[in-house]
Design a protein with these regions (language model features):
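Conserved GNAT acetyl-CoA-binding A-motif
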Residues: 89-102
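C-terminal "cap" of GNAT-fold acetyltransferases
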Residues: 120-147
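Short loop/turn motifs at secondary-structure junctions and domain boundaries
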Residues: 30-35
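A generic "binding-loop/recognition-motif" signal
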Residues: 11, 59, 102-103
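Conserved active-site alpha-helix within GNAT-family acetyltransferase domains
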Residues: 101-129
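Conserved acetyl-CoA-binding loop-helix of GNAT-fold acetyltransferases
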Residues: 68, 74-87, 99
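Short amphipathic alpha-helix that is part of the acyltransferase structural core
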Residues: 1-28, 41-43, 138-141, 146-147
């Protein structure tokens, strides 16, 4: 097997099936709603193992999607994809990367902090599964010192 190759994905829609099969809520035309600005994928021998997408919403840069195929979870792919998204945000002068996380502990291990600002959870609060099968937390990675 070849090593895992991480590369920017220009066609964000190519990641839809991975996101959907990973249990993420993603609808048709998601790119028109989320306004993705950066997507990164992890591939090995041409096979898609994982991906992440950063979007611009609510005047913020948001890690909207991160998914890794079940058989390769635990190998550091999700961590690497997150780090590459953070590098992208730093590279364009961003000061923070926001997310609504179903697995907040994963992101906290990477130094994300919980926030009380629930702008990203607004849609979640209207979902019938909120608080039952799904209870995401809003988190933020601060990339520059905040006052």
């Amino acid at each position: 097997m070849d090593k895992i190759v991480y590369a920017e994905e220009k066609e964000h829609e190519n990641l839809t099936e991975l996101y959907r099969t990973s249990g993420l809520e993603i609808g048709e035309g998601w790119t028109e709603v989320c306004h993705p600005v950066f997507s990164i994928s992890a591939r090995q021998d041409g096979m898609l193992l994982g991906a992440a997408t950063v979007s611009r919403r609510f005047r913020r840069l948001v890690l909207d999607y991160l998914a890794v195929e079940i058989p390769v979870r635990g190998l550091g792919i999700g961590k690497k994809l997150t780090e590459l998204c953070l590098d992208y945000v730093r590279g364009i002068g961003g000061s923070a990367l926001w997310l609504a996380a179903r697995e907040p502990e994963f992101y906290k291990r990477l130094h994300a902090r919980e926030t009380e600002d629930a702008a990203l959870l607004a849609d979640c609060l209207r979902c019938p599964d909120y608080g039952k099968d799904c209870a995401p937390k809003e988190l933020v990675f601060y990339l520059k010192e905040t006052s």
